[in-house]
Amino acid sequence: MSIHIRKMRYLPLVAALALAGCGGDDGGAGSASALSSAGAPHTSSSPAVTAPPSASNVDKSVSPVELPDTVVPVNYRLWFRPNDALNAFDGRADVEIKVLKPVNNIVIAGHRIKFTNGRITLQPGNIQLIATPQDKGDFYQLRPVAGTIAPGNYSLHMEWSGIINFKSYDDPATQTGGSCGDDPYPGCSAAEGVFRVDLKGTDGKTSGAILTQGETNLSRQWFPGWDEPAFRPTYEVTAEVPQSWRVVSNAAEKPSTNVGGGYKLVQFEKTPPMPSYLLFFGGGLFDTYEDDFTSPLPGGKGGLHLRVFTPPGMSEWAKPAMDRTKQALDYYYRYTGIPLPLTKFDTVAANDAFKEQKDLNFGGMENWGSILEFADDILPQPGQPMSHYGNEVLTHEVAHQWFGDLVTTDWWDNVWLNESFATFFETKTTIQFFPNEFSWLDQVKNKYRVINRDIGPNAFPVAPNFNDWASNDFVLSASAFTYDKGGHVLKTLENYLGEQTLRKGLQQYLVDYSFGNGTPKRLWDALSKESGQAVGPIGDSYVRQTGVPLISLDTQCDLTKNQTVVTLKQQPFPNKNAYPGLQWTVPITLAYGQGLAKRTTLALKDTQAQTRIEGCTGVIADPSGLDYYVVNYSDTAWSGLLTQVNSSTDPVLLANLKSEAALLVANNLAPASRSTSIGSVASPAAMKLRQTPTFDGIEAVTKERPARQYQGLFKPRKVVTQ
C-alpha cells in the first residue's frame, strides 16, 4: 500500500499498521542528474525471461493469530447495496465453511456493523445462530441456540448493515461527530471498510462514489468474516448500484441486470484465493482508458486486459499511467517468471474530497487485480509526464501483486515481507524505466536518513514481533523501518549474494508459497538454498532488532606474504534506542586493489574477525555505498583508502564516505579531520559530486510516512513465527 509523505501526529500501534498501505520511497525523490547511472551496477535492459523453479513440497499455511483455527472459510458469495445518500449499506453473504472439530460457536471479525436478527443461519440443518459481540465489537461469537456445531461442511448465511465512511469527524478539533465520532479507537480515518469519495470531473462537477479499503483489518467494516492473513478464501462479489455507475472489483465483471428503481445488479467472477484485506469494490461515474498487456512469458501466458478508471472526462489523462503499468507488469513478469492468476488488471484513480485535508492517509493500495491510486498522483494533464511520486507509487502497488498478494505475510508484525519488497522493487523499476528521475546519490541520502532514525529514541525493528511494549508503542515512525530500512536490508543482501542469486531465491520463495503465506524463515531458507550461504542469521539480525552495526576496520601490510591483514570488529552504533540491538551477522563486501576493482565478501558474525587479501593495498568496506552498516576506519586504513579514493570515478562511493564521516564526527567517533580529508579529495568522482548541489550529506528527517491504522491493539504473539 502506498502512503503520502507528510508529517503526522504519533498514534499508538494501531495507527501504525493499517493505512500505511504501500508505496513510494520517502527519501529524496531522485533528481534528474548526470549521476543517475553512477554507483551500484545495474543493467539497462529488462530482466531476461527465465522459467521459474519447480515448487518444493512445503507447507504454505500458517496458524491464525486472533481467530480460532477450528473453522475455515472456503468461498464467499458477498452481496451489498449502498443507500441513495451513500452513507450506509446493507450486506449479506453465504460463506462455504469447513468446521474442523466440534465447536460451541463460530468466531468472526466484525466492526461497526449491525447483524439482522434472525438472519444468521447455518445449513444444512437450518441452525439459527445468535451474534454476540466480543472485544469492543471487533469480534462476534455466532452461537447456536442449543448444542454444538459438529465437524463438516456448511453454508453460513449472514445479513447486516454497515456505515459508508465519508468524514473523519464533524468537528476535527474535538474529534466528535461524523462517521468516526462514535469510534473509541485512535486514528480513525475516512478510508475504512466502505468509504465515499467525491469524483470531480474536468467540467468541475462532483459526484459521489464508493471505494473500499481493507488493510490491515478494515474489511471487517464491510463484511464480517475471517479478517487476517492466515485465511485465503475465494470471493464472488455482487452489488446493487445506480444504473449510471461503472464498477470494478478484483475479478472480471459479468453482464449486469436491471433490478428497477434506477439500480442494476452487477456481478463478478470468482477471485483467486486471497486474504480479506485485498478484496476491493469501487463504483461511481468513472471513465475508463483501456489497453491490453502482452505477457513476455513463453506462449504469452498471463496476458491481461488493462483498464484505468478515472474521474469523468479524464480518461485521456490516463495514458502515462497505462504505459507505466504495462512497463511494470513486463518487468515483474520477467523478473519472477510467474504470471498473475488474473484475466484483467485495473487501476482505479479517484480524486476525492479528502485530498486537500489528507485524511485518507495513503497514496495507493495493492488490491489484487484492482489497485487503488489517486488522480493527482498518476493522472497528469495531457502532454505532461507523470510525477516521480506517481511512478513510484504505481510500480510499488504492482510489485505487491507478487509480494503481498500472491504470497502474503503471515501476520502484521511481518508486514515488511510485503512493504520492504515493494519499496525495493520500486527502486529497481525506477532505474529501469525512469533513469533521468533516479540518482544513487539519493539512495545514499535516504540510507542515512533511516540510520538517523534507527539510532534515535523512536526506532523500531523492521519486524517488531508484537508483544506488550510493541502493542502500545509501535507508533507511526515504525513505517520508516517497515518500508525503507527493510528495502535497504534487501539491497544489502543483494550486494552480498549477487543480483541473480537473489532473484533465483525469490523465484523459489514465490513458487513455493504461492496462494499461501510467507514468513522470514521461509524467505531466508529459500535464499540460503539458492546461495549456499546461511542467510537466516544475517536477515534476522537486521529485521528483528533496532540500530545499525558499527564496523571498525583496520589494515596492516604483511610484507612477507604480500598480503593485507584486515581486522574487523563490530559493536552497536551509539544510540538512544529503548530496545537496542547488540550484535549482528553483517554481510560485508570489501573492495581493494588498483582502482578498488577487486572484491571479497564475508559475514561478520562474531565481535571480531580477520581476513587476508592479496597485495598491500587500500581497502574499503561497502564499495556500493548502499550497505546497511557504518564503517569506522583506523588511521592506517583511512590513509590507504584515501590513496585509492583519490583516483575514484564513482561519486556514490565518495558520497557514502562523506556521509559516513559526518555521522562519525557528529557522534565523536572520529576526529574532525576525517570529514575535511574526504572533503578535500580531488578525484573525478569528487568533481561530479560537487556539481550536484542536491547532495549535502546528512539531513534531518522532517517527513514521516503515516503508518497503518488498526482498530484496537493487536494480539501479542507468544512465539516468533518460523
Regions found by a protein language model. Give the residues of each.
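Bacterial Sec-dependent N-terminal signal peptides
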Residues: 17-50
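Hydrophobic alpha-helical and helix-loop surface patches within well-folded domains
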Residues: 29-34, 115, 268, 300-301, ...
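A ubiquitous short alpha-helical element
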Residues: 59-61, 79, 313-316, 410, ...
